From Swiss-Prot:
This is Histidine--tRNA ligase. It is found in: Cytoplasm. Signal peptide: none annotated. Its main location: cytoplasm. It comes from Lacticaseibacillus paracasei (strain ATCC 334 / BCRC 17002 / CCUG 31169 / CIP 107868 / KCTC 3260 / NRRL B-441). Pfam families: HGTP_anticodon, tRNA-synt_His. It catalyses: tRNA(His) + L-histidine + ATP = L-histidyl-tRNA(His) + AMP + diphosphate + H(+).
Amino acid sequence: MNYQRPKGTADILPGQSERWQQVEAVARKIFAQYQYHEIRTPIFENVDVFSRSAGDTSDIVTKEMYTFKDKGDRMMALRPEGTAGVVRAYVENKLYGPEHAKPYKVYYLGPMFRYERPQSGRQRQFHQIGVEAFGSDSPVLDAETLALAKQLLEALGAKHLKFVINSLGDPATRKAFHAALVDYLTPFKDQLSEDSKVRLVKNPLRILDSKDKHDQEIVANAPSILDYLTPEAQQHFDRVKTLLQGLGIPFEVDATMVRGLDYYNHTIFEVMSDDKVFGGGYTTILAGGRYNGLVEELGGPETPGIGFAMGVERLMLLMQGELPTAQPDAYIVTIDQGADQEALQMLTAIRQQGFTGEMDYMGRKPKGQFKAANKANAKLVLTIGESERAAGTVQIKNMATGDQQAFPQADVLADFGKIYTQVMEAK
């Protein structure tokens, strides 16, 4: 039987994984500049963590979650997104306590799981990098979060970016808009998709996010939530826009944007790209917003929050250029089998001194070893044969210049760095 990876998954192979490591390293560095610290949560949670946070009418909960019963007959789900698990951890570990900094800032990275139709940049197991900040409802934090998103994407080389924002207001806003939206949609009830007929009763805002083309035609003339913002919600949104303008972050306001998760309120945003790799049109590569109320929903005290998540697979499509391959600093060639012990001791010492190195493990003849060193693009080749062992020396060749000279093995073992600098800088 030929075993294949599950549909909608990918093997991240050497040559590809280095790019992922590069993205993660850049993200970690920038997050540290903003005082975010890493959090790692389980890849599966009690299913209620997601149904209570994302909303039981959301597509994620109704159609896309991978669920299973454990041996204790508890219903579990592979995490479809990162925020809910982080909020659960925030509440369970009492990270809202007075001993913790406020706002409490964390970031995460790792795999998520949704049962979707696989396509370019969209997998059933996919990866996200995200941030969450708890404890402040200041519009300044909203603006900082968008500034962080912009800095991160630009540092990763993303281009053709468009920032789109909206406000979903506060509970009073949502209540007034809910009533207006139901009044507008009710005459179209029989024309709505089956999913949206259910949403009309349970959560009509979800209809604004419908992927059904006929639903989209109906909601095109729906009321705007921006017309129902309370004075407090309007003031918050106006302040966010002013701050973004002051930061030089261009943005568009899209009153129909609601995001796919029920926990959002006040400021929400998406960052899109129309890069040609997406086949035309704008594709979302980062999105997030405020979720004041979500901590309480999962059993914690009243705590505002804001965050975003970035899809790594989609970002990878924007980073198709070749990465420089990692060159080993040293490759050790053995002329005879008896040199294996000295070679291994020397290679171990070189690595322990912070350098990269390799040797032959395939029993190749010297000619084959030199070919392997060339293929690996080694900077230096160290050769040990019978005469070198007898003299306690090693031949070291600079592969770029072809220069070669002998050094005592003891010097390599004691201070390879000094020899490396001398050989690499020799004219």
